[in-house]
């Protein structure tokens, strides 16, 4: 799967808590290469949830608000 595929699946998560649960579950199930793509998509989704806005590409200024 690609980062975009993971991102589309993660967009079903509507809260940060749900996203964290999905991240925790997949941490043990994915290979290292898949995990790198998954974490990238998860960070992207976390930024979207934090700003309450969907992005194709996250602006650099948004990352200062993400914990």
UniProtKB/Swiss-Prot annotation:
Keywords: DNA-binding, Transcription, Transcription regulation. One of its GO terms (molecular function) is DNA binding. It holds the Pfam family HHA. Gene3D superfamilies: HHA. It comes from the Bacteria. Belongs to the Hha/YmoA/Cnu family. Modulates the thermoregulation of VirF, and hence the yop regulon, as well as the expression of the enterotoxin gene yst. Involved in chromosome structure and DNA topology; probably by means of compaction of DNA in conjunction with H-NS; probably requires H-NS to bind DNA. Monomer. Interacts with H-NS, in the absence of DNA. This is Modulating protein YmoA. It comes from Yersinia pestis.
């Amino acid at each position: 799967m690609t980062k975009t595929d993971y991102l589309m699946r993660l967009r079903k998560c509507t809260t940060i808590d749900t996203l964290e649960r999905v991240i925790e579950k997949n941490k043990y199930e994915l290979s290292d290469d898949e995990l790198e793509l998954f974490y990238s998509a998860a960070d992207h989704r976390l930024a979207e949830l934090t700003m309450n806005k969907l992005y194709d590409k996250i602006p650099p200024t948004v990352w200062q608000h993400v914990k």
